């Protein structure tokens, strides 16, 4: 599929509307311990990571993006000492994603950085520095290593689930970056296979287990088909909603690796019709989640220690991700004012 074929579908459409979704999930609740001090620490870390000048346009954008706020929405019960490390990790995830997608980074540098990040995840920082020659990337990699070391003090990951999930994300980032550079547009099924991993949801679900010290992996609970199903539903919901939110930003940079334009090209429909189909997919996922959650309760699986903490944690993640997507300026730009109804019309 060629990029030109996607661009031609939307040539006549200058605006699009996102309808309300997330109407069947639990209401999002902000962690009451998340305060201005925590947010300022995370913002300061982001500014140092990117070497931002105070008051610059990029610094204001990062500050209004409120990258640490996502942690407070999706982990509303964790204690204060865990909020900042998790917030920094989320921020590093977004910023590293931007770096790996940057045309200023050569494909060889990108491969070396992805390989180095995998070594950092396994605590092998000295080895990780060997393939990376760019001094700025080395500096950022050291900062990421420090964040992961701090995070490890608050997460139980004896099975290695979190590290394994992050490694898969980095593997798929390499594939995604290759597709972007070569302007390869996959079909919808192939894209959703990739997006399921590049969305980064798997390590974030692993953090539910690790931060709350549920030890579900060690006890074999995660192998149950119903648990696998709620994980799959949550992953697709988060990935698809993020694609709705990021469409305008990605469109402006010529990035067509998004469910909306790919679906439009596959189904031969316009932009707004494609958005309506994605919104309908989200609503179906929410209904499916409610049914599966009921099955977990009625089957007796909910009686196992930690199961409902995990299932409810996935639902909170889905709802919190929607809330943050409409609150943050990351997808909308400086001066963004969140609409109370979490829907709106946008200009391309």
UniProtKB/Swiss-Prot annotation:
Q: In which pathway does it act?
A: Secondary metabolite biosynthesis; terpenoid biosynthesis
Residues binding Mg(2+) 3 are 242, 246
Top-level division of the source organism's lineage: Eukaryota
User: Does this entry carry the keyword Coiled coil?
Assistant: no
Q: Look up the EC number in the record and give it.
A: 4.2.3.77, 4.2.3.-
Q: How is the cofactor bound?
A: Binds 3 Mg(2+) ions per subunit.
Keywords in alphabetical order, please. Lyase, Magnesium, Metal-binding
Kindly give the SUPFAM superfamilies that the UniProt entry links to this protein.
Terpenoid synthases (SSF48576)
Q: Where does Mg(2+) 2 bind?
A: 97, 101
Primary role: Sesquiterpene synthase converting farnesyl diphosphate to eight sesquiterpenes, with (+)-germacrene D and an unidentified oxygenated sesquiterpene as the major products. Has no diterpene synthase activity.
Q: Under which name does UniProt file this protein? A: (+)-germacrene D synthase
